Regions:
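Pre-Walker A adenine-sensing motif
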Residues: 18-30
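Conserved nucleotide-binding/hydrolysis micro-motifs of P-loop NTPases
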Residues: 72-76, 104-109, 134-135, 164, ...
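Conserved P-loop NTPase
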Residues: 1-8, 12-14, 105, 122-124, ...
Length: 242
């Protein structure tokens, strides 16, 4: 289903296209430019593939440099995941088109923010993926403090004209739930701050209806409601938007 655009203010110029086949048709041409978006789903649902595809397409299709911020995966793991779909991240890193930074979970939010801002300026970054976002607040239990810290980070990214995707897992069986690391305090904070919420589902039973994506929130966007089936092919995610 192709959605009808509402006005010129939602034109392509105000969008950051993901380049994921079929997905951008669900949300008026892509993510709202300079927005903060969360991609949620269980293990194996397609979150990491979506992030890598977003960054790869940013460079190869739209000439936008990207930053992958990780707290778990090593560079080599990311290269191996990407090359399965024909995406040569190692070459893009060598060419300075994509940067990968791996932080320790003990790194302070302030140090993370400073390093991100430095990379953005030095490498003309336009797209950022953070995986997983729960690590940013895992040591905090006070909701107001979590909101303050995440607000400072996301505000800085918006100020620097960055379109950001945060990724994390939903609990087992939590089809419509939003949970980061199983902690509802952090969940509410991130849910409040994000402009877009995108859920990936996988039943694990196989077949045409095994996987679906659902945009549950996207500000300033007349997005498709309800789950839409997708496949993970040898070239990445393909959404059935018809």
């Amino acid at each position: 289903m192709v959605l009808k655009k509402r006005s010129d203010k939602n034109s392509f110029n105000n969008r950051t296209p993901t380049g994921v086949p079929g997905f951008d048709l669900l949300c008026e041409g892509g993510l709202y430019r300079n927005s903060i978006n969360a991609v949620l789903g269980g293990p194996g649902s397609g979150k990491t593939t979506f992030l890598l595809q977003f960054l790869y397409n940013g460079v190869t299709l739209y000439n936008e440099n990207g930053l992958y911020l990780s707290f778990e995966s090593h560079d080599e793991d990311i290269f191996l995941d990407a090359i399965n779909y024909g995406w040569d991240f190692q070459k893009l890193v060598n060419d300075g088109k994509i940067r990968i930074i791996r932080f320790s979970p003990k790194t302070s939010i302030e140090d993370i923010r400073k390093q991100i801002e430095k990379v953005i300026i030095n490498h003309n970054i336009k797209r950022i993926c953070i995986d997983p976002v729960s690590i940013l607040s895992i040591r905090l239990e006070n909701e107001l403090l979590i909101r303050e810290i995440l607000y400072d980070l996301t505000t800085a990214l918006k100020r620097m004209n960055i379109t950001t995707i945060l990724a994390d897992e939903t609990p087992e069986g939590g089809v419509d739930s939003f949970s980061l690391g199983g902690d509802e305090v952090r969940s509410r904070a991130v849910k409040f701050l994000c402009d877009g919420l995108i859920n990936f589902y996988s039943s694990g039973i196989g077949g045409e209806t095994d996987r679906a994506v659902r945009i549950t929130k996207m500000r300033r966007t007349n997005h498709k409601r309800g789950p839409v089936p997708f496949k993970i092919t040898d070239k990445g995610i393909v959404v059935n938007s018809k």
